[in-house]
Amino acid sequence: MKEILITNDDGFEATGLLALKEALSELDGVNVTIVAPSSEKSACAHSLTLTRPLRFIKLDDNFFKLDDATPSDCVYLALHALYNKKPDLVISGINHGANLGEDITYSGTCGAAMEGVLQGIRSIAFSQFYENNSLNELGFELAKEVVKFITPKVLNDEISLNPREFLNVNIPATTSKNFKGYAVVPAGRRTYATHATLNRNPRGIEYYWLGNAALEYEKGEPSDISKVNEGFATITPIKLNMTSYESLESLKGKFDAK
């Protein structure tokens, strides 16, 4: 029996999480444990909670929410408190929205996969791309097919992942009928506009809402961004070693002792 730990950043009631659970329940020989945040934690990246205690709340057999926790908290604490032996796989998702290009650095979905990798466990992040608030209409049927296609390949070692790497998978905003297939591509490059909306509360105190600016991307070589827009499910291996080897040697010449 293969053990899979799943979490997300949209919270324990998210339809994407339940779709992931349903998809994995259709696979033979797997046992799934869910530990998810008690509320939405989008864009919390790889943050851990170090300034207050965390509490498991059991919802069902093998289904827990972690009170006011981040996705990385869920992975970290599940491994230390619920497992005597490490699970075979950590899966994060299915995220409500894509995690493309530099989204990966903000994403709590990807942050949970990073935590799994840091703990020595193979990990996958799944995200469902959608447009114009169409997620309810689109649903997760194609995403579930993608999960059922990719997950066994990782579990059965058909896909070899290097240590400290995880797979970032984005599902296109289309149906199974119009699905183009799979594209293994690098992460693209987003162009982020700085945007914040200023408001005032009834006492006249100012506050801001961040975000809501349109996201663009740099066109050129095929990437996760371009291919998911063409109807492909994109698969991008992400490594945690962030050293810029291109600059390493030139910097050594300027700073190393003579």
UniProtKB/Swiss-Prot annotation:
GO terms for molecular function: 3'-nucleotidase activity; 5'-nucleotidase activity; exopolyphosphatase activity; metal ion binding; nucleotide binding. It catalyses: a ribonucleoside 5'-phosphate + H2O = a ribonucleoside + phosphate. Its EC number is 3.1.3.5. One of its GO terms (cellular component) is cytoplasm. The keyword Cytoplasm applies. InterPro entries: SurE, SurE-like_Pase/nucleotidase, SurE-like_sf. Binds 1 divalent metal cation per subunit. It comes from the Bacteria. A divalent metal cation binds at D9, D10, S42, N95. Its main location: cytoplasm. Its cofactor is a divalent metal cation. It is found in: Cytoplasm. Coiled coil: none annotated. Keywords: Cytoplasm, Hydrolase, Metal-binding, Nucleotide-binding. It is an enzyme of class 3 (hydrolase). Nucleotidase that shows phosphatase activity on nucleoside 5'-monophosphates. Belongs to the SurE nucleotidase family. This is 5'-nucleotidase SurE. The gene is surE.
